Amino acid sequence: ERKSIKGIIARVHLEEFEKGIILPHEFTLSKAKEYRLNLMKATNCNFSQIYALYMDSEHTTLATIDNESKDTPKLEFTDGEGVTHRLWIVTDENVIAKLCADFADRKLYIADGHHRYETALNYRNYCRENGLSKVGDPCDYQMIYLVDMEHPGLVVFPTHRLVRDLPDFNVEKVLDGCREYFDVTEMNGDRKSVV
């Protein structure tokens, strides 16, 4: 079944998590952030947008998006996985002002890109500490794809992670905890067939 989802790619002001405006749902690994920070320092570039969700019970923003995406898109292509991407560019100042007003009091929930977001914060701080930027410069912002949390095309795919080297890790205790909420099936075979 083909799905379709619409959102906004926007320049979003970076906020510390403590402010409760942009919210994470997972912890990050320092090694991945270090790599990304070094890449940003070397290139002064933001290579990949963050994916964030917002709540809009009236779906007013989605109505605006639908209205702005009636004409032929500025760009359309199908990627190697068969996903078609369409991009419309909004230049009408009134529409932009309306969209900005829509988000004035909204929280954003990071769906994908926790490492990138934290790296963007670290990069902004690095630039300020080293006199490379001031408040309002580009490093105060991050490219984020914003999607209505109740969009009918929203699909959340599973993420499979391998956990290892945890101190005092007890596999049976973890599996017992999982059995409270899930059906747990033991798989036999070599590691490659299971992972």
Explain the meaning of each model-derived region:
Residues 1-195:
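Surface-exposed, charge/polar-rich loops and edge strands
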